[in-house]
């Protein structure tokens, strides 16, 4: 777990050193939260085979509070998903539940719009496409947990954990993504929740 650039620097140095002393291909070391990494830290994490797990939900819930503590300029780099995409560095989006609600659509919406609940936009240059954000809560999340062979996409032989949404997040207005209703949830192909 590392939030600020100082903590992320310590973790990055540790991963670099570990890979020098005990090289491990495909280690998939993680930096949980990873809220304020610099571009160069993301480059170094990639080189060390490490990945960010962005805790982006606070930007939606408490963007103004973060800006009050560290300034709007720094909040503009909060969970820089676009930089990670540009580097070809897979990442996931997580909620740190119960800190923020377990609602991947809020995470997707926040990564795409970079907008707080009060309507403030922070770091629009770090916004990503809807598809990129969806990958962060599906196939990339599975990959970072060494579960891409059983989760993260709908492929024969995988668990068939999925949701049926009332609307297509790829076609609705980006700010509406967080409001899309979940009609059904499937685990292992079985319905475990139905909105009916």
Each model region followed by its residue ranges:
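His/Asp/Glu-enriched, well-ordered alpha-helical/loop segment
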Residues: 6-29, 33, 39, 43, ...
């Amino acid at each position: 777990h590392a939030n600020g650039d100082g903590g992320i620097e310590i973790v990055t140095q540790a991963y670099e050193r570990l890979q020098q002393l005990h090289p491990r291909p495909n280690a998939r070391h993680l930096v949980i939260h990873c809220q304020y990494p610099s571009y160069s830290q993301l480059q170094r994490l990639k080189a060390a085979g490490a990945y960010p797990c962005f805790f982006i939900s606070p930007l939606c819930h408490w963007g103004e509070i973060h800006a009050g503590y560290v300034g709007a300029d720094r909040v503009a780099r909060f969970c820089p998903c676009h930089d990670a995409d540009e580097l070809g560095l897979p990442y996931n989006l997580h909620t740190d539940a119960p800190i923020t609600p377990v609602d991947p659509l809020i995470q997707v919406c926040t990564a795409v719009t970079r907008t707080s609940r009060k309507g403030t936009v922070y770091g629009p240059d770090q916004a990503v496409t809807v598809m990129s954000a969806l990958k962060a809560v599906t196939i990339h999340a599975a990959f970072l947990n060494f579960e891409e062979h059983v989760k993260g996409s709908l492929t024969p032989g995988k668990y068939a954990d999925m949701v049926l949404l009332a609307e297509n997040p790829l076609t609705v207005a980006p700010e509406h993504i967080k409001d899309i209703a979940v009609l059904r949830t499937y685990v292992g192909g079985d319905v475990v929740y139905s909105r009916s």
